[in-house]
């Protein structure tokens, strides 16, 4: 009765996931990411903050299909999950530094002019302000490496791979954001 009075019966999934879903909705305009079958066509798959192998079993066969077709699987997670163990690369990021890593990757992409300028002009607002913030030295890979525990060279390589996915003759990048990112301070 207590939770009913609070309106908790109206929560989309769980109280913990609702905040993240509201944030995603405000930024992307939709709560859902790519359909699981879309991952089969990816050239680079980033699993960020989750154990897909154990917790998204419906997605795993599509990731396996993509890998059979040459896709790389990179897991960004402080924990060595089963998914991380099966990945081509596991980036064991320091707890609570996911946002810093994302900003570091964006810094590289914008500094090197790897962004999709046509898409940005057509589909976004506020990009000039975002770019000014992202290009600050505090978001440079060398600074981000100190916070995240991920080498600056790795941040640069991952940013370039993400930006160039789909341009390299293989499929585009597909990112699976999971709830682990929103469940600690300073995360994405």
What are these regions (language model features)?
Residues 1-188:
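Cofactor-pocket helix-loop regions in the catalytic cores of large enzyme subunits
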């Amino acid at each position: 009765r207590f939770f009913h009075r609070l309106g908790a019966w109206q929560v989309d999934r769980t109280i913990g996931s609702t905040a993240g879903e509201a944030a995603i909705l405000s930024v992307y305009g939709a709560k859902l990411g790519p359909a699981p079958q879309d991952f089969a066509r990816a050239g680079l798959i980033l699993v960020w903050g989750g154990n897909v192998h154990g917790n998204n079993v419906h997605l795993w066969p599509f990731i396996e299909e993509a890998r059979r077709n040459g896709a790389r699987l990179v897991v960004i997670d402080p924990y060595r999950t089963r998914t991380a163990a099966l990945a081509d690369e596991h980036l064991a990021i320091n707890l609570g530094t996911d946002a810093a890593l994302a900003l570091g990757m964006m810094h590289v992409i914008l500094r090197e002019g790897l962004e999709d300028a046509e898409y940005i002009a057509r589909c976004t607002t506020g990009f000039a302000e975002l770019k000014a913030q992202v290009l600050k030295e505090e978001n440079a890979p060398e600074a981000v490496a100190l916070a995240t525990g991920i080498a600056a060279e790795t941040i640069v390589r991952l940013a370039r791979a993400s930006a160039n996915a789909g341009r390299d003759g293989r499929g585009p990048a597909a990112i699976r954001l999971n709830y682990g990112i929103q469940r600690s301070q300073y995360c994405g």
